[in-house]
Amino acid sequence: ATSNSIFSFGAPQTSTATATGSGIIISDDGYILTNNHVVDTSSSNSSYSYYDISDATSVKVKLNSGTYGDDATYDAKIVGKDSQTDLAVLKIDKTGLTAAEFGDSDQAVVGEFVMAVGSPLGLDTTVTQGIISAVNREVESDGTKYVCIQTDAAINSGNSGGALVNSEGKVIGINTLKLSGSGVEGIGFAIPINSTLDVTSQLIDHNKVIRPYIGISGINLDDSTAKKYNLVVGVYVKTVQNFSPAEKSGLQLGDVIIKADDKDITTMDELNNIKNSHKVGDTMKLKINRKGEEKELTVTLEETP
């Protein structure tokens, strides 16, 4: 049943280059979830390499021929894309499709049996098997951090955007990255499906992801760094953007943010995670240390410009 909801697509990058990938049908009327990139590790020496789907001059979707026939190829529209989460939603003019069933990726456990479904190297609806090697694995690619499911199921060029499914055939992840290089085998990463739900909904509704922002840059202060500069542990405010929510709240250069919504913070990642749990228009409480004196500020979050 799962393979009925899998497709492959070709996205010509220039007049002489074509990239391919995989994806998942998420509605019976033609919405398809994939990555914001098309994996092509053979074209780069980087462990992670891809082309941005927005560079494509056209995108075509080929549905599972066993279900929809040999000529089931359609032009696709890019509904929305988000480079921060490496997700994109496509739309084809087709109804009566079989949508994939989602599992609960929060329940994924190490050692659990999984299958990677996609079109590696253009080999349509290929299935490889393995286990979940790790959960909540933090991976950085091109400056962006992802929290992923790690698997040893074979993931190759063209698998990107395809489904990682559990033993019930339910999608628990979007195959996204692999480590490659001499002596490296069986290290692939999938975006947990639960983390895609809100992004997918926003891409369909707004053609983009609407995120709140504060408007600062900061420096992480751990114990040793804080002691060295006679500061407290937290996030040192390095810059405050003009007319930003941070400036409007009274936050200043040199402040050290020590709590956000009553939670201790020591890194910008922690601050951003709390911020991202809010919606535009929400308020966020900050406790700061300013020249040895603690103060509380309230930031009203605005849409990222």
Regions found by a protein language model. Give the residues of each.
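Serine-dependent protease modules
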Residues: 1-227, 232-233, 241-242, 268-279, ...
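Conserved PDZ fold ligand-binding element
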Residues: 31-36, 246-268
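Short beta-strand/loop motifs in extracellular/secreted proteins, especially
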Residues: 57-59, 255-256, 284
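Short, conserved beta-strand segments of beta-strand-rich sandwich/propeller modules, principally
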Residues: 283-285, 296
